[in-house]
């Protein structure tokens, strides 16, 4: 039987769940270009053991952009991943255009409106941005 403390000490402190924050400022979404994947996406990552999905999603956003969010992101959607975990997507609408300081996981960033999304972009993120029920401020 595997104990929680053994998982933590072996470096396995992530769950199968993950989450991210879609930050929207003046009808534009903050997106980052993945260093390994070469795909535009939102700042996201694994949720650690003991974290709530919102906590993990905000932590990942801050780690990957060096931006401290002022506001509480709202859960916009979630889906089951192939590994059995759940991905949680949060949205935060703000009026401040932050300049992220990227970490090793990203090579570029930008704010993009619905009609100017970069390519290649994660299919699910693109769908979420284009879905007026989830991100109405991005609708032209």
Question: Which stretches of residues belong to each language-model region?
Answer:
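Proteolytic processing junctions in secreted/extracellular precursors
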Residues: 4-11
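N-terminal strand-loop-strand
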Residues: 11-42
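A generic structural signal for ordered secondary structure
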Residues: 6, 20-22, 28-31, 74-75, ...
């Amino acid at each position: 039987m595997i104990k929680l403390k053994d998982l933590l000490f072996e470096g396995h402190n992530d769950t199968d769940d993950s989450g991210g924050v879609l930050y929207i400022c003046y009808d534009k979404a903050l997106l980052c270009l993945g260093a390994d994947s070469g795909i535009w996406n939102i700042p996201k990552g694994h949720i650690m053991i003991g974290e709530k999905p919102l906590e993990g999603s905000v932590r990942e956003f801050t780690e990957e952009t060096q931006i401290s969010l002022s506001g509480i992101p709202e859960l916009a959607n979630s889906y089951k991943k192939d590994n059995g975990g759940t991905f949680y997507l949060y949205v935060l609408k703000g009026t401040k255009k932050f300049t992220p300081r990227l970490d090793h996981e990203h090579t570029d960033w930008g704010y993009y409106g619905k009609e100017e999304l970069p390519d290649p972009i994660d299919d699910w993120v693109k769908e979420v941005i284009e879905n007026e029920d989830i991100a109405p401020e991005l609708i032209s």
